[in-house]
């Protein structure tokens, strides 16, 4: 999916509002995913998945950092996310559907925290962005 110039502007503006909260929002999205889609917990058998756990917060920071990296490389997402794609495809073997589930939870989290900025156009742009990130992360599965 190709991001238009307007999409890129919307994504950068929205992520700019996220600011230093990317890790917190990532952790919140993970918690939402674990609650709403309990089968996703199977990829984290060694984690304490309780609310506010240090392990979920640490992984949320990784998610937030990866998305921040992606926002900074909207014109070369495959290059920017190549190592993460390798990790998830070859080492972790995460089922690709889980990226869609986490994307849904990220959108919900952003809508809660950025209600005035989460317009239909921004929602659509963020959805396209997260879908593109998911596609890149699953590209090495083939």
Curated annotation (Swiss-Prot):
Signal peptide: none
Residues binding O2, per UniProt: 59
Residues annotated for heme b binding in this entry: 88
GO BP: any one term: hydrogen peroxide catabolic process
Entry GO terms, CC: blood microparticle; haptoglobin-hemoglobin complex; hemoglobin complex
Domain of life the protein comes from: Eukaryota
Pfam families: Globin (PF00042)
Function: Involved in oxygen transport from the lung to the various peripheral tissues.
Protein name: Hemoglobin subunit alpha-2
Source organism phylogeny: Eukaryota, Metazoa, Chordata, Craniata, Vertebrata
Originating gene: HBA2
């Amino acid at each position: 999916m190709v991001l238009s110039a307007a999409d890129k502007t919307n994504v950068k503006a929205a992520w700019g509002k996220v600011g230093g909260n990317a890790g917190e929002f990532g952790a919140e999205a993970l918690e939402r995913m674990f609650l709403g889609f309990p089968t996703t917990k199977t990829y984290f058998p060694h984690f304490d998945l309780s609310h506010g756990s240090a392990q979920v917060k640490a992984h949320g920071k990784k998610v937030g950092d990866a998305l921040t990296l992606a926002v900074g490389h909207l014109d070369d997402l495959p290059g920017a996310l190549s190592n993460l794609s390798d990790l998830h495809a070859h080492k972790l073997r995460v089922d690709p559907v889980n990226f869609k589930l986490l994307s849904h939870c990220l959108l919900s989290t952003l809508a809660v925290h950025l209600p005035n900025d989460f317009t239909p156009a921004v929602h659509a742009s963020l959805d396209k962005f997260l879908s593109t990130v998911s596609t890149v992360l699953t590209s090495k599965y083939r």
